Amino acid sequence: MITQRRLQHLLALVEHAHFGRAAQALNISQPALTKSIQALEAELGATLLDRKRGAIALTVFGELVLQRGRSLLSAEADLRREVALLAGHEIGSLKVAIS
């Protein structure tokens, strides 16, 4: 199943360009990250990554999933924010600079 977690794993992998560093940033093991990406590929029936000599690159399918995944995760965050605002709960962060 395409899950939020698997999409977040793909985004982290692309951001860090390395399975080990992405796994560390996600606080999961490298084998767990590998299994998550493989499960996403199996679910979609497409190879998302080119894995050559320790380097990774997105395939055309990977680029599409990355783009749509970002949109889905952003839409989910927006929905949560809007529902919280309607329910009277404030969420988010405010940065203030004083000079």
Locations of the language-model features?
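A short LG(V/I)-centered, amphipathic sequence patch enriched
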Residues: 41-58, 63
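Glycine-centered flexibility sites
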Residues: 17-20, 32, 45, 62, ...
